[in-house]
């Protein structure tokens, strides 16, 4: 059961059967400049994402970033069949971004003896309302790349002026991301209800 649930993040870091592959190397993408991790910290709701085949069908997905000025961490959670499942990991600015000051960070999760790194690029954010994250992996065996993307919001619903801004931003990245393929998350009261919690990370998880 757990191996199936962990599939989501492992798949993003590697390659999944349901990935859509595009020929050639990852496109040249520029993350946001002057990225401010302190301002970015907080709870982000996953409004929508590009789908992965066979991934968990978690709802009410939230990524919470904490930063005390020196050390950062991430707490990802989602609800499946009344169970709140969560993953805790470390977060740091990507090595090259420490010099360029661009929006790239590394999340490290440990599933027993297995360590998985995920490197989201922040394509756009106003820090207070929305963020658009992006990840691209090149697969030498296929001579192709796969893309993942997420629309994040500090609130459970993306609406009004913020939604308009996000829609316009996605249009500027239409050469990278097919917005029509985004799958929306569910943050309804029913979807977010849970009666127990379960950790996916830790020394006894594999």
From Swiss-Prot:
Homotetramer. Keywords: Disulfide bond, Pigment, Secreted, Signal. Disulfide bonds join 26-136, 60-192. Synthesized only in the caterpillars, apparently by the epidermis and secreted into the hemolymph. The protein is passed over from the larval hemolymph to that of pupae and adults and is sequestered in the eggs. The keyword Metal-binding does not apply. Residues 1-17 form the signal peptide. One of its GO terms (biological process) is response to reactive oxygen species. This protein binds a chromophore: biliverdin IX, isomer gamma. Mixed with lipoprotein-bound carotenes, this blue protein provides hornworms with their green cryptic coloration which serves a camouflage. One of its GO terms (cellular component) is extracellular region. InterPro entries: Calycin, Invtbrt_color, Lipocalin_ApoD, Lipocalin_CS, Lipocln_cytosolic_FA-bd_dom. Belongs to the calycin superfamily. Lipocalin family. It is found in: Secreted. PROSITE patterns: LIPOCALIN (PS00213). GO terms for molecular function: pigment binding. Gene3D superfamilies: 2.40.128.20. The molecule consist primarily of eight antiparallel beta-pleated strands, which enclose a hydrophobic pocket, and an alpha-helix. The lineage of its organism: Eukaryota, Metazoa, Ecdysozoa, Arthropoda, Hexapoda. It holds the Pfam family Lipocalin. This is Insecticyanin-B.
